[in-house]
Amino acid sequence: MIDWTSTMQQTYEFYIVDPISWKDTKLIRNVKSCTINRDSTAETLGSASLSMTEIIGECYVRIYLITIQNGVKEKHPLGTYLVQTPSSSYDGRIKDITMDAYTPLLELKEKQPPLGFTIEKKTNEAIMTAAHRLAQEYSRAPVVPAKSTTKLTSNFTAGTDDTWLSFINDLAA
């Protein structure tokens, strides 16, 4: 176990993530820099920006902090992000590609429920079970189910400006 108050060596590793199994598949070796922004006020809870020398295309990337202390190496996950929107520049020697990356919640934020989408009270489905089912259905990220037996007391209908993310958040609230 790392003693975070003592000295250690630190580095970072970046892996492409299989969107089906959600496992690391390939180490990315061409990352020049990375910034992670965590924002509890943002709907998707944060983002990241990666500077690379090659385009990797749209994919999920998992970022790890690697620590070495007293000869013990540990890998600490910092987040998994959907990488997209590359912009590039070339200074004559080095190609620099900046890629924006977003938490997996982006998939739920970009899609809307059909007009009039409703979870009816009569289905007798627990609220958190319904939230889990919808999050799992409309995103590729694994979703951990929450335990709750609370049921709807009335029909729950999506608003015209709801995204799947806002609908699920409102349902679970």
Task: Walk through the language-model features, giving the residues of each.
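Assembly/oligomerization scaffold segments
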Residues: 1-117, 170-173
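Charged- and aromatic-enriched interaction segments used to assemble
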Residues: 93-98, 102-173
